[in-house]
Design a protein with these regions (language model features):
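Generic structural concept
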Residues: 10-13, 17-27, 47-54, 58, ...
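Amphipathic alpha-helical interaction modules
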Residues: 28-72
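Acidic-enriched, low-complexity/disordered segments with a strong bias for Aspartate over Glutamate
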Residues: 10-12, 39, 67, 71-76, ...
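Short terminal alpha-helical segments
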Residues: 1-43
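Amphipathic alpha-helical binding modules
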Residues: 76-125
Length: 125
């Protein structure tokens, strides 16, 4: 029973998959900015938009060991492009860890499946 409660919900998985794609898009954009102008500061608009994605990922991963390493970007002391890439890199690593923990190959599901509270034995995805 306790193990099932620590599994993500089906809603968490759906949201996670959407946020994972958004995170990759942000990473690719910020990587380009960091290559061209690593020390240039982000503006408040970018920080707010990036934090909107990061905060939702952080919420899904609040019970994971990686949570303590997931910081939001500081809106007051605007981070540089290279600082942003470091933070996003930590989220990307946490996403890989999360996926490897709860997503697996299942013969029964004939493909990849998620362990969730509603489907502790796995749900095809």
């Amino acid at each position: 029973e306790e193990i099932i409660n620590t599994l993500p919900t089906d809603a968490d998985v759906s949201k996670f998959e959407m946020l994972e794609k958004l995170m990759e898009s942000i990473y690719e954009e910020m990587k380009e900015f960091a290559k061209k102008k690593p020390d240039e500061l982000l503006n408040k608009f970018k920080v707010k938009n990036i934090n909107r994605v990061l905060s939702q990922i952080k919420e899904i991963m609040k019970h994971e060991p990686t949570d303590e390493f997931l910081d939001l970007l500081d809106e007051d002391s605007l981070p540089s492009n290279s600082d942003c890439i470091i933070i996003i890199g930590q989220y990307r690593a946490a996403i890989v860890q999360y996926r490897s923990q709860y997503h697996y190959y299942s013969d029964r599901a004939l493909g990849r499946a998620w362990h969730t509270q509603g489907h502790p034995q796995g749900q095809p995805k």
